[in-house]
Amino acid sequence: MAIYAVVGTQWGDEGKGKIIDFLSSKIDYVVRFNGGNNAGHTIVVNDKKFIFNLLPSGVLQGAKCILGPSVVIDPLILIQELEVLKNNNIKTEIFISDKAHIIMPYHIKFDELSEQKKGIHKIGTTKKGIGPCYADKINRIGIRTIDLLNTEIFANKLKTNLEEKNQIIEKIYNDKPLDYDDILNTYKKYIEILKSLITNTEKILHHAINSEKHILIEGAQGTMLDIEHGTFPFVTSSNTLITAAAGCGIPISKIKQKIGIIKAFSSRVGSGPFVTEISNSIGDIIREKGQEYGSTTKRPRRIGWLDLLTIKKAIALNELNHLALTKLDILNNIESLKICTAYEFQGKIYDYIPTSCETIEKVRPIYKVFKGFKEDISNIKNYDDLPIEAREYIEFIEKEVGIQISILSVGSEREKTIFRNQEWSNI
């Protein structure tokens, strides 16, 4: 039995989808433990691009897929993704936790209206209803997938919630109320499609562990968007750390292989402090070469140099023992590359990320500068064949964080991957 966990070390969009995809080739179960359709992961197989927002990345390898209790589910999006699998003749088993919460139309409405009302102070959410859905969960008024299996229970909870939500929509936001019958009838159609997938996933995972099955746990977003440890309030609404995987029913002590995904540069979607942000044309070049646009929102991502403070924080919080570096190929033909090693503010050197966003906004990055490499590295298969400049960049990261980068991605396709030890190439 082997249980792997994969998490992002930055602000999401690190390239987790590709890494998870090939790790899933010999995995029995892939489990998503957090977030909703605000996360997007892109996988390229045989020159065909797949983008999923809810289904785990391992779905293309035939692993059984579980959406855990802490995932919030938009039924329409999930149905659309299931249709993609069907249309591409991809056969797999999908299990939805009966404890997972359901995104309702009023959650999406609240998300949109709240962002509008905040104006220049908006968080920059995806407006998918994720935050309002988690808020209802915390307030203990959310609708769970188990409620969908009993029409009377679902209808009563919807009625109670909608009466309260419509009061807020009308009186606080001066907008039109939502219609109860429209929502009920629409969701009844969703229920017919999804009800056979809703089950006790905790029981399935316990059986899998006892049967010594191989399990891969997949996190959405990244460490710096964690609700507790990220750049609050410019964060997501869920816990993104490996510790949150316990919510799936898998004891943390069982997870031996913890893999952190690092993008060779930094990116961020939406508002919030971004110390290493590149404000000149180099940022634009990296964005275009790397196609750095949100999988979910299509918004252009903000681009920055690699920030080692975020990587060190992610390693410490997640107890990572393996690293994968992605999109190294995007950095070719750039004269100088930079890595941030510390921050400075008012004469004080920070080797950690301050808690206050107001402080983070004011710090100055301290950089180590590297000579760039010109070669196209996207077809290189062996580490020693990489340009010396690329290897110096990689080895500096390893020296600073104390963990070997075992996997290098030099292109979006599965085969454009360099393994630095036999353990990963044989999985």
Swiss-Prot record:
Annotated localization: Cytoplasm
Listed InterPro entries: Adenylosuccin_syn_GTP-bd, Adenylosuccin_syn_Lys_AS, Adenylosuccinate_synth_dom1, Adenylosuccinate_synth_dom2, Adenylosuccinate_synth_dom3, Adenylosuccinate_synthetase, P-loop_NTPase
Predominant localisation class: cytoplasm
Residues that, per the record, bind Mg(2+): 13, 40
An example Gene Ontology CC term for this record: cytoplasm
MF annotations from Gene Ontology: adenylosuccinate synthase activity; GTP binding; magnesium ion binding
Biological role: Plays an important role in the de novo pathway of purine nucleotide biosynthesis. Catalyzes the first committed step in the biosynthesis of AMP from IMP.
Gene expressing this chain: purA
GO BP annotation list: 'de novo' AMP biosynthetic process; IMP metabolic process
EC code: 6.3.4.4
Cofactor mode of binding and number, as noted: Binds 1 Mg(2+) ion per subunit.
Protein's UniProt keywords contain Cytoplasm: yes
Residues reported in the UniProt entry to bind GTP: 12-18, 40-42, 301, 327-329, 409-411
Reactions the enzyme catalyzes: IMP + L-aspartate + GTP = N(6)-(1,2-dicarboxyethyl)-AMP + GDP + phosphate + 2 H(+)
Domain of life: Bacteria
Keywords for the protein's UniProt record, in alphabetical order: Cytoplasm, GTP-binding, Ligase, Magnesium, Metal-binding, Nucleotide-binding, Purine biosynthesis
Family membership noted in the UniProt record: Belongs to the adenylosuccinate synthetase family.
Subunit structure as annotated in this protein's UniProt entry: Homodimer.
Catalytic residues as annotated in Swiss-Prot or TrEMBL: 13 (proton acceptor), 41 (proton donor)
Protein name: Adenylosuccinate synthetase
Pathway the protein acts in: Purine metabolism; AMP biosynthesis via de novo pathway; AMP from IMP: step 1/2
Top EC class, one word: ligase
